[in-house]
Protein backbone atom coordinates (compact mmCIF):
# COMPACT_ATOMS: atom_id res chain seq x y z
CA UNK A 1 0.00 0.00 0.00
CA UNK A 2 1.58 3.34 -1.03
CA UNK A 3 1.99 5.74 1.88
CA UNK A 4 1.10 9.43 1.69
CA UNK A 5 3.89 11.99 1.84
CA UNK A 6 4.18 14.34 4.81
CA UNK A 7 5.06 17.99 5.32
CA UNK A 8 6.27 19.19 8.72
CA UNK A 9 6.09 22.92 9.46
CA UNK A 10 8.20 24.28 12.31
CA UNK A 11 7.51 27.82 13.56
CA UNK A 12 10.59 29.28 15.21
CA UNK A 13 11.67 32.41 17.03
CA UNK A 14 14.95 32.53 18.96
CA UNK A 15 14.77 28.77 19.53
CA UNK A 16 18.28 27.76 18.48
CA UNK A 17 18.78 26.02 21.83
CA UNK A 18 16.26 23.31 20.92
CA UNK A 19 15.76 23.54 17.16
CA UNK A 20 18.48 21.06 16.24
CA UNK A 21 16.65 18.27 18.12
CA UNK A 22 13.51 19.01 16.08
CA UNK A 23 15.42 18.99 12.79
CA UNK A 24 17.25 15.77 13.58
CA UNK A 25 14.05 14.02 14.62
CA UNK A 26 12.45 14.76 11.25
CA UNK A 27 15.61 14.04 9.30
CA UNK A 28 15.99 10.55 10.76
CA UNK A 29 12.45 9.34 10.12
CA UNK A 30 12.44 6.19 8.01
CA UNK A 31 10.17 4.59 5.38
CA UNK A 32 8.22 7.76 4.69
CA UNK A 33 8.65 10.75 2.37
CA UNK A 34 8.78 13.96 4.39
CA UNK A 35 9.63 17.59 3.73
CA UNK A 36 10.57 19.93 6.57
CA UNK A 37 9.69 23.61 6.37
CA UNK A 38 10.99 26.03 9.03
CA UNK A 39 9.31 29.43 9.26
CA UNK A 40 11.48 31.63 11.46
CA UNK A 41 10.22 34.94 12.78
CA UNK A 42 13.48 36.85 12.36
CA UNK A 43 15.53 35.28 15.15
CA UNK A 44 18.69 36.94 16.48
CA UNK A 45 20.10 33.99 18.45
CA UNK A 46 21.95 32.18 15.66
CA UNK A 47 18.94 30.25 14.38
CA UNK A 48 19.67 31.12 10.75
CA UNK A 49 23.27 29.92 11.10
CA UNK A 50 21.91 26.59 12.31
CA UNK A 51 19.40 26.38 9.47
CA UNK A 52 22.11 26.98 6.88
CA UNK A 53 23.79 23.75 7.97
CA UNK A 54 20.89 21.70 6.60
CA UNK A 55 20.50 22.03 2.81
CA UNK A 56 17.49 19.68 2.81
CA UNK A 57 15.38 22.20 4.75
CA UNK A 58 13.01 24.71 3.25
CA UNK A 59 13.19 27.77 5.43
CA UNK A 60 12.58 31.49 5.58
CA UNK A 61 13.45 34.03 8.27
CA UNK A 62 11.29 37.15 8.36
CA UNK A 63 9.03 39.00 10.82
CA UNK A 64 5.60 37.45 11.34
CA UNK A 65 2.46 38.04 13.36
CA UNK A 66 3.13 35.21 15.80
CA UNK A 67 3.14 31.43 15.92
CA UNK A 68 -0.17 30.89 14.11
CA UNK A 69 0.86 33.20 11.28
CA UNK A 70 4.17 31.36 10.89
CA UNK A 71 2.41 27.98 10.80
CA UNK A 72 -0.08 29.23 8.21
CA UNK A 73 2.76 30.48 6.01
CA UNK A 74 4.36 27.06 6.18
CA UNK A 75 1.05 25.29 5.53
CA UNK A 76 0.62 27.29 2.32
CA UNK A 77 4.05 26.12 1.12
CA UNK A 78 3.50 22.46 2.00
CA UNK A 79 3.45 19.86 -0.77
CA UNK A 80 2.84 16.72 1.31
CA UNK A 81 -0.42 14.78 1.35
CA UNK A 82 -0.46 15.25 5.13
CA UNK A 83 0.58 18.44 6.88
CA UNK A 84 1.44 18.98 10.54
CA UNK A 85 3.39 21.37 12.72
CA UNK A 86 6.24 20.63 15.08
CA UNK A 87 7.23 23.43 17.41
CA UNK A 88 10.92 24.26 17.50
CA UNK A 89 11.35 22.91 21.03
CA UNK A 90 9.58 19.58 20.38
CA UNK A 91 10.67 16.50 18.44
CA UNK A 92 9.37 13.31 16.84
CA UNK A 93 10.03 9.81 18.12
CA UNK A 94 11.45 7.00 15.95
CA UNK A 95 8.89 5.69 13.49
CA UNK A 96 6.31 8.28 14.49
CA UNK A 97 5.78 9.71 11.02
CA UNK A 98 5.61 6.26 9.44
CA UNK A 99 2.85 5.34 11.91
CA UNK A 100 0.90 8.48 10.95
CA UNK A 101 1.35 7.83 7.22
CA UNK A 102 0.31 4.19 7.55
CA UNK A 103 -2.82 5.12 9.50
CA UNK A 104 -3.72 7.73 6.89
CA UNK A 105 -3.34 5.16 4.11
CA UNK A 106 -5.52 2.66 5.98
CA UNK A 107 -8.17 5.26 6.80
CA UNK A 108 -8.64 7.45 3.73
CA UNK A 109 -11.82 8.87 5.25
CA UNK A 110 -9.84 10.51 8.06
CA UNK A 111 -9.19 14.24 7.73
CA UNK A 112 -7.16 14.47 10.94
CA UNK A 113 -4.79 11.79 12.27
CA UNK A 114 -3.34 12.08 15.77
CA UNK A 115 -1.42 9.96 18.25
CA UNK A 116 0.08 10.12 21.73
CA UNK A 117 3.01 12.16 23.00
CA UNK A 118 5.54 12.29 25.80
CA UNK A 119 6.24 15.25 28.05
CA UNK A 120 9.96 15.87 28.56
CA UNK A 121 12.01 18.53 30.35
CA UNK A 122 14.46 20.97 28.77
CA UNK A 123 17.11 18.22 28.61
CA UNK A 124 14.78 15.71 26.97
CA UNK A 125 14.30 13.64 30.13
CA UNK A 126 10.92 11.94 30.40
CA UNK A 127 8.50 13.69 32.76
CA UNK A 128 5.18 12.01 31.93
CA UNK A 129 3.21 10.50 29.08
CA UNK A 130 0.08 11.77 27.37
CA UNK A 131 -1.92 8.75 26.22
CA UNK A 132 -5.22 9.51 24.53
CA UNK A 133 -8.27 7.76 23.05
CA UNK A 134 -10.52 7.78 20.00
CA UNK A 135 -11.96 11.15 19.11
CA UNK A 136 -14.98 12.47 20.99
CA UNK A 137 -16.15 16.00 20.17
CA UNK A 138 -18.01 16.38 23.47
CA UNK A 139 -14.90 15.47 25.49
CA UNK A 140 -12.93 17.97 23.42
CA UNK A 141 -15.35 20.77 24.22
CA UNK A 142 -16.07 20.05 27.88
CA UNK A 143 -12.81 18.51 29.10
CA UNK A 144 -10.52 20.58 26.90
CA UNK A 145 -7.95 20.12 24.18
CA UNK A 146 -6.71 16.60 24.85
CA UNK A 147 -5.31 16.11 21.32
CA UNK A 148 -1.55 16.81 21.24
CA UNK A 149 -0.93 19.10 18.27
CA UNK A 150 2.68 17.96 18.06
CA UNK A 151 1.41 14.43 17.24
CA UNK A 152 -1.26 15.51 14.74
CA UNK A 153 -1.43 15.73 10.94
CA UNK A 154 -4.09 17.09 8.59
CA UNK A 155 -5.00 16.23 5.01
CA UNK A 156 -3.61 18.88 2.71
CA UNK A 157 -7.06 19.21 1.16
CA UNK A 158 -8.13 21.06 4.33
CA UNK A 159 -5.32 23.58 3.88
CA UNK A 160 -6.09 23.97 0.18
CA UNK A 161 -9.72 24.74 1.00
CA UNK A 162 -8.54 27.66 3.14
CA UNK A 163 -8.94 26.05 6.56
CA UNK A 164 -6.01 27.60 8.44
CA UNK A 165 -5.23 28.56 12.02
CA UNK A 166 -6.97 31.61 13.47
CA UNK A 167 -4.21 34.15 14.16
CA UNK A 168 -6.32 35.81 16.88
CA UNK A 169 -5.43 32.84 19.10
CA UNK A 170 -1.90 32.96 20.53
CA UNK A 171 -2.04 30.02 22.98
CA UNK A 172 -5.09 27.86 22.22
CA UNK A 173 -4.83 27.99 18.44
CA UNK A 174 -4.81 24.18 18.34
CA UNK A 175 -7.97 23.89 20.47
CA UNK A 176 -9.79 26.39 18.25
CA UNK A 177 -8.61 24.59 15.11
CA UNK A 178 -9.69 21.15 16.33
CA UNK A 179 -13.06 22.51 17.50
CA UNK A 180 -13.66 24.21 14.16
CA UNK A 181 -12.76 21.08 12.22
CA UNK A 182 -15.00 18.92 14.42
CA UNK A 183 -17.86 21.41 14.05
CA UNK A 184 -17.45 21.19 10.26
CA UNK A 185 -17.86 17.41 10.40
CA UNK A 186 -14.24 16.41 9.77
CA UNK A 187 -13.24 12.83 10.59
CA UNK A 188 -10.58 12.29 13.27
CA UNK A 189 -8.57 9.07 13.58
CA UNK A 190 -6.52 8.11 16.65
CA UNK A 191 -3.25 6.16 16.44
CA UNK A 192 -2.45 4.44 19.80
CA UNK A 193 1.30 5.09 19.61
CA UNK A 194 3.75 7.68 20.88
CA UNK A 195 4.45 10.00 17.96
CA UNK A 196 6.32 12.95 19.44
CA UNK A 197 7.75 14.59 22.56
CA UNK A 198 6.50 17.91 23.95
CA UNK A 199 9.18 19.84 25.80
CA UNK A 200 8.08 21.24 29.16
CA UNK A 201 10.24 24.28 30.04
CA UNK A 202 9.85 27.75 31.49
CA UNK A 203 9.81 29.57 28.14
CA UNK A 204 7.15 27.36 26.55
CA UNK A 205 4.29 29.57 25.32
CA UNK A 206 1.62 26.96 26.06
CA UNK A 207 2.66 26.73 29.70
CA UNK A 208 3.72 30.28 30.52
CA UNK A 209 0.53 32.20 29.67
CA UNK A 210 -2.06 30.67 31.99
CA UNK A 211 -4.41 33.67 32.04
CA UNK A 212 -4.52 33.98 28.26
CA UNK A 213 -4.92 30.22 27.91
CA UNK A 214 -7.98 30.29 30.18
CA UNK A 215 -9.45 33.25 28.28
CA UNK A 216 -8.94 31.68 24.85
CA UNK A 217 -10.23 28.30 25.99
CA UNK A 218 -13.40 29.90 27.32
CA UNK A 219 -13.79 31.85 24.08
CA UNK A 220 -13.66 28.63 22.04
CA UNK A 221 -16.21 26.95 24.31
CA UNK A 222 -18.54 29.93 23.98
CA UNK A 223 -18.17 30.03 20.22
CA UNK A 224 -19.01 26.36 19.74
CA UNK A 225 -21.80 26.09 22.29
CA UNK A 226 -20.21 24.34 25.27
CA UNK A 227 -20.74 27.41 27.48
CA UNK A 228 -24.42 27.90 26.67
CA UNK A 229 -25.25 26.47 30.11
CA UNK A 230 -24.93 28.05 33.53
CA UNK A 231 -21.49 27.85 35.14
CA UNK A 232 -22.73 25.18 37.55
CA UNK A 233 -24.10 23.05 34.72
CA UNK A 234 -20.91 23.51 32.72
CA UNK A 235 -18.78 22.34 35.67
CA UNK A 236 -21.01 19.26 36.04
CA UNK A 237 -20.68 18.47 32.33
CA UNK A 238 -16.92 19.00 32.50
CA UNK A 239 -16.66 16.50 35.38
CA UNK A 240 -18.89 14.05 33.50
CA UNK A 241 -16.73 14.15 30.39
CA UNK A 242 -13.55 13.93 32.46
CA UNK A 243 -14.90 10.67 33.90
CA UNK A 244 -15.93 9.51 30.42
CA UNK A 245 -12.42 10.18 29.17
CA UNK A 246 -10.87 8.20 32.02
CA UNK A 247 -13.25 5.29 31.41
CA UNK A 248 -12.25 5.17 27.75
CA UNK A 249 -8.57 5.06 28.66
CA UNK A 250 -9.16 2.24 31.16
CA UNK A 251 -11.24 0.16 28.74
CA UNK A 252 -8.71 0.49 25.91
CA UNK A 253 -5.73 -0.35 28.13
CA UNK A 254 -4.17 3.08 27.71
CA UNK A 255 -3.96 3.64 31.46
CA UNK A 256 -1.75 0.54 31.61
CA UNK A 257 0.44 2.06 28.91
CA UNK A 258 0.84 5.20 30.99
CA UNK A 259 1.86 3.16 34.02
CA UNK A 260 4.48 1.26 32.01
CA UNK A 261 6.01 4.52 30.83
CA UNK A 262 6.42 5.72 34.42
CA UNK A 263 9.18 3.15 34.90
CA UNK A 264 11.34 5.23 32.55
CA UNK A 265 10.82 8.64 34.15
CA UNK A 266 13.96 10.77 34.04
CA UNK A 267 15.55 8.96 31.10
CA UNK A 268 16.73 10.85 28.02
CA UNK A 269 14.31 10.47 25.11
CA UNK A 270 16.03 12.68 22.53
CA UNK A 271 16.94 11.26 19.16
CA UNK A 272 20.61 10.70 19.94
CA UNK A 273 22.01 7.79 17.96
CA UNK A 274 25.32 8.04 19.79
CA UNK A 275 24.06 7.28 23.27
CA UNK A 276 21.50 5.33 25.26
CA UNK A 277 18.87 7.97 24.52
CA UNK A 278 18.32 6.32 21.15
CA UNK A 279 17.34 3.00 22.72
CA UNK A 280 15.08 4.70 25.25
CA UNK A 281 13.45 6.80 22.54
CA UNK A 282 12.90 3.86 20.21
CA UNK A 283 11.45 1.60 22.89
CA UNK A 284 9.06 4.24 24.21
CA UNK A 285 7.77 5.01 20.74
CA UNK A 286 6.48 1.46 20.35
CA UNK A 287 4.56 1.34 23.64
Task: State each model region's role.
Residues 4-7, 35, 176:
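Cell-envelope/extracellular polymer assembly enzymes that use nucleotide-activated donors
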Residues 24-33:
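Short, acidic, metal-binding catalytic loop of nucleotide-sugar glycosyltransferases
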Residues 62-78:
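Glycine-rich, basic loop-to-helix element that forms the pyrophosphate-binding segment
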Residues 83:
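Short aromatic/hydrophobic "clamp" motif used to bind/position activated sugar donors
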Amino acid sequence: MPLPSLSVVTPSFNSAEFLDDAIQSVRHQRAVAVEHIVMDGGSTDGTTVLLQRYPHLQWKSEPDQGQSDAINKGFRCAKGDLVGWLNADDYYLPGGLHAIARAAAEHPEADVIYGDCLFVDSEGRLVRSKVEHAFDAAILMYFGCYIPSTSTFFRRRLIESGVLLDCDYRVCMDFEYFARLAHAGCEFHYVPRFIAAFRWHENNISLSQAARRFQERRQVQLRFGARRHSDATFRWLADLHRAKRMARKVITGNIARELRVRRMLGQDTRWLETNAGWETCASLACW
